């Protein structure tokens, strides 16, 4: 049906404008004396940063869609307005910035009452912003901000004809652990056009909780094929992972820049170390994040050791995080012994009182979450 996509876009724009109008009505109660267009926009950006960011993200999305259509020799469809233009075209903004409205505001302006009203409003908004920021940070806590080395292989495998539903779920959950341009594009495509209800809704939720603008699509109408209604809890064990690694599964295609050998008791500092490596575009293998769907602590077995051996083999470098906890861990000893057996170069981040020993020392700045080294990592 011609025009359906454009009508959906227009309807979505109307709903967004309605929400923005409600926000701006509240904001109009705390405008300063003799405000202007610049004042209004700056105040909106300051007190409603997430709404402003979503306007920017939405513009970028639909601009890319138009560019894609143009590239394919088709007419552009959406013609989205840049965020500033969108903002100032809102009827309520035009009303707030009208000469009559500003004159009336100035005539009734009370500086003391304004200061008190603005302070309360700002405090309320800061609490709301802080709360949302904390939720987004929590959702992103274990996600690596780096493009995985195997992403193209995984995305190609997802779209391969004949792939099972569980295999699609596996790839989804793997790419969910990374934040990059390609993973974002992958999840946006799933949220818009994936025909399985569970996966499409999972893609929507993942994008939403991690702080991205996304629209929930309705379930497809009409007669549904079996695949569209399939679902899975994807409960897996170390043995399931081992079987996948030993077969020609996507798990066998993984490559990591660094395997972190550490104690799980040091999880708080390990999260910071991972972020520091990610700043340098270095991908990390950390068992309780990278294989969280398979290596559950309550299911530890001999299969876990075999899996860890394979992950060490798939990693280009080994980084030992030396702490009092890791020095007492038999798992860490096992990982280091196997790494030496393979002839892997061993790096060390020493957070203990002991000497570094025979390894290449990496300097880790806990406060700034940065890592530097004098010897090169294999890339």
From Swiss-Prot:
One of its GO terms (cellular component) is cytoplasm. Its main location: cytoplasm. Activated upon phage infection. GO terms for molecular function: hydrolase activity. Pfam families: ThsB_TIR. Residues 254-379 form the TIR domain. It is found in: Cytoplasm. Gene3D superfamilies: Toll/interleukin-1 receptor homology (TIR) domain (3.40.50.10140). Keywords: Antiviral defense, Cytoplasm, Hydrolase, NAD. Coiled coil: none annotated. GO terms for biological process: defense response to virus; signal transduction. One of 2 TIR-like protein components of the Thoeris antiviral defense system, composed of ThsA, TIR1 (thsB1) and TIR2 (thsB2). Phage infection activates this protein; by 70 minutes post-infection with phage SPO1, TIR2 generates a signal molecule that in turn activates the NAD(+) hydrolase activity of ThsA (tested with B.cereus). The signal is similar to cyclic ADP-D-ribose, but how it differs is unknown. Expression of Thoeris in B.subtilis (strain BEST7003) confers resistance to phages phi29, phi3T, SPBeta, SBSphi11, SBSphi13, SBSphiJ, SPO1 and SPR but not SBSphiC. Homodimer. This is Putative cyclic ADP-D-ribose synthase TIR2.
